[in-house]
Amino acid sequence: MLTIDHLTKTYGDKKAVDDLTLHIAPGEIYGFIGHNGAGKTTTLKACAGILPFDAGEIRVAGVDMKTRPLDGKRLLAYLPDNPDLYDYLSGIQYLNFIADVFGVDKDTRAARIRDLANRFVLTEDLAQPISAYSHGMKQKLAMISAWLHEPKLILMDEPFVGLDPVASHLLKEMMRQHCDRGGAIFFSTHVLEVAEKLCDKVAIIRQGKLVASGTMDEVKGNASLEDVFLELEENHDA
């Protein structure tokens, strides 16, 4: 579903992502773990087609994101850590705008918006301007917009930060359901307990370089993910 092959991205003389190779298969929830500045957000933005990169290839369902970026973007949704929505629109206007962009017909979008807004308890707020939304409400609206066109791949940057427990539980359910239907999810997180319970596979990145990846058992063995992460950090600092 998502193939990252020798990805390199440089800012000035610093390699934010250094020769990164990963493969996320259909049906997988893949966690991306690392400290702030490790290269997680840069990688996700490159995969989403909104950040040019210096070397390597990124393919979404076989579509090359460098040569066919529009075709690739139609197959995915990207949720940044701080959704930058159009504050002058109402919630429903924003969702209709997203549906228009992805060519979702009116009957289909109405049914999906109704279902998703009910699940996120946002129905009564859709008529309100986004400028009146709290951070948590904006996150929920962004999540509805991500699922609205039923993408094959969903990319998320720290999706659980700021969510209340009910919304967090719902998001986990929706992530699993999406992958059970053959989709894939690649998301960054610093909440190791969430990754340990939710992910089929994880990758750990440090200073732009991949230091561990694989199934949870392959990466952590009998230890906790937190122990493995800290041990890798200590080994690289030594």
Language-model-detected regions and their locations in the chain:
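Conserved ABC ATPase "signature" region
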Residues: 96, 100, 108-125
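Catalytic Walker B motif of ABC-type/P-loop ATPase nucleotide-binding domains
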Residues: 154-158
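ABC ATPase "signature
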Residues: 213-214
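Conserved ABC transporter NBD signature motif
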Residues: 56-67, 71-72
